[in-house]
Amino acid sequence: MYKSLFFCLKILALLFLIGCGIVAYIIYYYSRDLPDYRQLARYYPPSVTRIYSRDGKLMEEYAFERRVFIPINSIPTSLKESFIAAEDKNFYNHQGVDLFGIVRAAFLNISNFLHHRRMEGASTITQQVVKNFLLTNEVSFQRKIKEAILSYMISRVFTKDQILELYLNQTFFGRGAYGVATAAQNYFNKSVEELTIAESAFIAALPKAPSELNPEKNYARVKARRDYVIMRMLEDGYITSDAAKEAVDSPITLRKRDQDETVTADYYAEQVRDEVIKMLGSKDEFYTSGLTIITSLDAKMQKFAEESLRKGLRDFDRKRGFRKAIATISLDNWQEELKKLPTTPSLLEYKIAVVLEVTDTQAEIGFASGAKSKIPISEMKWAKSELKSAKKLLTKGDVIVVEPVKDYYALRQIPEVNGAIMVMNPNTGQVLTSVGGYDFFASKFDRVTQALRQPGSLSKTFVYLAALENGVKPNQIFNDGPIEISQGPGMPSWRPKNYEGKFLGPITMRTGLEKSRNLVTVRVATAVGLTKIVDIIKRFGINDNPQKVYSMVLGSIETTLERITNAYGIIANGGKRIKPHFVELIKDRNGKVIYRRDDRECTTCNVSDNDLDNAILEIPAENIYMVTDAASDYQITSLLTGVVDRGTAYSAKKLGKVIGGKTGTSNDSKDTWFIGFTPKIVVGSYVGYDTPRTLGRRATGSSVVLPIFIDFMSNAYKDEPPLPFKVPDSVKLQAVDRATGQITPSGSVMEAFKINNILIIEDDSEIIDNNHNNDVFDYVPTEKDQSQEIY
């Protein structure tokens, strides 16, 4: 008997040794080409880059994987315990592989199989880290062996907290969220510190099936999984029975970001994205580095700018009348027919509907959802002049655009025309708002920075400034009469015209600019010479290489809204050079400032995300460069305030502010502009078709674009006091008769004169009536260049 027992023991020992040898060989065999697990010590996960407004509102997030890295010591205990209870009960007790868990799962799964219950796994958190970082998702015996070997090795090198940190930051939680910090934000709009036990359990439940566990689609299943995690926490002693009951009884309530925490500024964000990618030299680095980018954007102004631009474009488009229905469908199965239609771009708050019935007084409409409503004829009047019956406008089956108004709808259409608006701080160059079009998602073409257009009469300002720089006084008399410019041998003479074809005769230079008189502008140009005008256009950054041609003075050059707005910003700040900038500073994922918009030490950069406005810096005095002299700058500013007080921008006077500005309309009314400024902001706005064509015979900067400026200022600038422009010491104000230009004891306008020529103006009655000029120019105007009706 003993011999038999001894023999059996020898056999068992031999089998054990053979088994150990096999295991040792397997470990040796699969350990030869394992990935380097030590790389996990250098874990820098791809993190989301976020762009903020100056007042701390989130503008945009960019990432290949939306993740915000959070160190383990910042993750609350209850959240860590939720994952340990859900995924790896013995996490702190095993060496990467839970042998007891494997045996337990094997026996439990036999019962689960027989009773058709969900099978349980025994994969530890460490094994999941190995799978997520070092191996593929291949389902094979070989991968499981490698996974177990690596898990053991990692457990010997890394602490449990280091392993848990890797897992909680790398795991995918659905809704594009990687890591617990992003999951907490995405699902509950909270930081991890603010999560309740129930919310922590919900997040811990997601890794099993993140795409399927959507409470909006399968609430019961998601709640059951969350409650399972809660009960595991109770069983493991992490929470009390009362806390578990409260957590189980709580509903799953998802929360989105509050609107006051975010700002919509798609064109602005895209400009920042492009700028920072160029700065970094790598698109991948931008999308993975977890940068915090603080911009100059003013969230409140941005909202008003978008609203004002869209309102202005819609109002202009409606004045052109109703074009036509976007489609016509059969009413036999109209709901399905509506659903089949291609998506209409730029709907925004508008909706698509089909006309079901039409009477003289209204139209009945239906929506793809099956809902019905009506459009009264009062909401169609804009579409056609003297509309007496809705039947004259719409027919059954017409697919149209509508807007909800109280308990009915109004007929609308998507504007064909487009435009842009940009707001800057003229003293710092900060771009406070930038809206590059009607709808970013319909057209990403940025009409602020990319659209080259003719500025029309906006150019006149710089013709007058060139004259002022060269000693011409603002009360100088010029003849607003016919003028003929020789274009050279064999070419017809150039005969520019005023917008309305009339003449005012002898008028002051001030009146010439206020009323935007083309012929006075040409005479000012001939008096000062094209060379000086070309120089000033380059100096102010309007165009880097303008053609030296007389039609240039009426706006035949090309520029962008950003450039021309910046040029007027220089005037607004007293003549100091500025450069538009969107980005204030950039911090890396660790909070270190890696860029700021000037070279000074930043003493206010370490601010919280809710106090970003404190990081805004002013321009250092040592960096100031004068583009024009202070006296000439104030003189042109004074003339431009006259444009608002008495001239083509008179309707803006009702704003009750001290505003300088200039309207602009290019040849054939293809481009319309208005740029207005105060000592604190400069606002540039533009309207035109993307493929240039006339906006209509009566379309001008005054009628089309100025209303956008007024609407914006009425909202965004209403609480600002009417600050005057500072008068430099080199200027003296003198009362002048506005009609004659003569000094009077109590004139109709206070004119600005330079100190060095104030004494020689009292007897200045010369009328400049030059009909030709000997200045040499290097380009001969053509028929295309003959901007004869600029306003």
Curated annotation (Swiss-Prot):
Region annotation Transglycosylase: where it falls in the sequence: 49-220
Entry's Gene Ontology molecular function annotations: penicillin binding; peptidoglycan glycosyltransferase activity; serine-type D-Ala-D-Ala carboxypeptidase activity
Gene Ontology biological process terms in this record: cell wall organization; peptidoglycan biosynthetic process; proteolysis; regulation of cell shape; response to antibiotic
Catalytic reaction equation(s): [GlcNAc-(1->4)-Mur2Ac(oyl-L-Ala-gamma-D-Glu-L-Lys-D-Ala-D-Ala)](n)-di-trans,octa-cis-undecaprenyl diphosphate + beta-D-GlcNAc-(1->4)-Mur2Ac(oyl-L-Ala-gamma-D-Glu-L-Lys-D-Ala-D-Ala)-di-trans,octa-cis-undecaprenyl diphosphate = [GlcNAc-(1->4)-Mur2Ac(oyl-L-Ala-gamma-D-Glu-L-Lys-D-Ala-D-Ala)](n+1)-di-trans,octa-cis-undecaprenyl diphosphate + di-trans,octa-cis-undecaprenyl diphosphate + H(+); Preferential cleavage: (Ac)2-L-Lys-D-Ala-|-D-Ala. Also transpeptidation of peptidyl-alanyl moieties that are N-acyl substituents of D-alanine
Origin superkingdom: Bacteria
Main localization, broad class: membrane
Pathway: Cell wall biogenesis; peptidoglycan biosynthesis
Active site positions, chain numbering: E87 (proton donor), S457 (acyl-ester intermediate)
Enzyme nomenclature, EC number: 2.4.99.28, 3.4.16.4
Region (Transpeptidase): 398-711
Cross-referenced NCBIfam families: PBP_1a_fam
Transmembrane segments: 7-27
UniProt cross-references to Pfam families, sorted A to Z: PCB_OB, Transgly, Transpeptidase
Record's keyword terms, sorted: Antibiotic resistance, Carboxypeptidase, Cell inner membrane, Cell membrane, Cell shape, Cell wall biogenesis/degradation, Glycosyltransferase, Hydrolase, Membrane, Multifunctional enzyme, Peptidoglycan synthesis, Protease, Signal-anchor, Transferase, Transmembrane, Transmembrane helix
Family under the similarity heading: In the N-terminal section; belongs to the glycosyltransferase 51 family. In the C-terminal section; belongs to the transpeptidase family.
Record topological domains on the Periplasmic side: 28-791
GO cellular component terms given for this protein: outer membrane-bounded periplasmic space; plasma membrane
Protein's name in the database: Penicillin-binding protein 1A
Stretches assigned to the Cytoplasmic side: 1-6
